[in-house]
């Protein structure tokens, strides 16, 4: 499958029975063949010993408006691919990969249909990999565990330089010299665990998905019912990093607003007292968490056209 402008190609294969995918940009590899699949509790992984049962292609080209965003209206234009698979060995479980190719990236997700037996699905982790074609320069936010404030410095390190035990937050920005800038992230998370990334093994350019564990059952990440769909796994792609900022790819992958009437929503700039703490210049009161400071901030916002406090 290719993007509407033909620059991006996504290929899904079952070489040797293992479900895999690869991505190229302008004819150059971005992601080498990378493993797909789900690791299930008390069951073999879902994604090995698979064969393609059917393939369906389509396209989307629509526009919509949003209360706030980078551009308005937003155009949602992509080519779509749905690959239905089934195991070649018993119990012949089924899996569908739904994918989209945009001019600014690709996305895919897992769909697990009813299997005809128990409809509960218990996911330990995903087998999803991102095998970068080069030892790219990355700019990760390294987290100490799955419960953090997400406040730390972004680093500059090659893929092979990421410690195998480091937990990488998304989005992850990477520069593949001579090929593209990419950002790995996710979209449409609903009734599913958040995804992080970890370095596969030392000296490898492969990153693997890590799902946040459940608090009540730490050995599991997702407990839900079939039919089930995962969030989108997103690879944003551009020749320049600024194009990633301009992209509407993630919002296009998210579902439409559940709020039918958005006319009452008035977006605007907002001040927040934590931004400046208790600091205020040339005032006749003691700055701090007090009424005088809040009134000072409100007056500042009024004078400078800042709508909210």
Question: For each predicted feature, which ranges?
Answer:
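N-terminal accessory beta-strand-rich subdomains and adjacent acidic, glycine-rich linkers
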Residues: 1-257
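An acidic-aromatic substrate-binding cleft motif
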Residues: 225-308
């Amino acid at each position: 499958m290719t993007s509407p402008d033909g620059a991006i190609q996504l290929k899904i294969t079952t070489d040797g029975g293992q479900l895999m995918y690869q991505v190229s940009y302008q004819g150059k590899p971005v992601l080498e063949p990378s493993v797909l699949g789900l690791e299930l509790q008390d069951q073999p992984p879902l994604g090995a010993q698979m064969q393609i049962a059917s393939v369906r292609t389509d396209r989307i080209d629509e526009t919509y408006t949003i209360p706030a965003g980078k551009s308005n209206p937003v155009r949602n234009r992509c080519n779509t691919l749905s690959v239905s698979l089934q195991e070649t060995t018993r119990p012949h479980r089924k899996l569908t990969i739904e994918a989209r190719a945009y001019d600014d990236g690709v996305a895919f997700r897992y769909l697990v249909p009813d299997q005809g037996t128990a409809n509960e699905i218990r996911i330990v982790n995903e087998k999803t990999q991102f095998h970068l074609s080069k030892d790219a320069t990355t700019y990760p936010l390294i987290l100490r565990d799955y419960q953090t404030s997400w406040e730390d410095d972004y680093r500059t390190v090659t893929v092979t330089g990421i410690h195998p035990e480091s937990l990488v937050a998304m989005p992850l920005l990477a520069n593949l010299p001579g090929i593209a800038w990419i950002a790995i992230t996710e979209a449409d998370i609903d009734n599913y665990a958040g995804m992080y990334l970890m370095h596969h093994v030392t000296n490898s350019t492969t990153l693997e998905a890590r799902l946040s564990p459940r608090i009540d059952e730490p050995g599991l990440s997702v407990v839900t019912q079939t039919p089930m769909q995962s969030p989108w796994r997103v690879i944003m792609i551009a020749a320049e990093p600024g194009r990633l900022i301009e992209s509407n790819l993630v919002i296009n992958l998210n579902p439409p607003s559940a709020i039918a009437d958005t006319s009452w929503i008035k977006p605007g700039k907002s001040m927040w007292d934590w931004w400046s703490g208790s600091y205020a210049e040339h005032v006749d009161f003691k700055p701090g968490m007090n009424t005088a400071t809040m009134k000072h901030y409100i007056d500042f916002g009024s004078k400078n056209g800042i709508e909210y406090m």
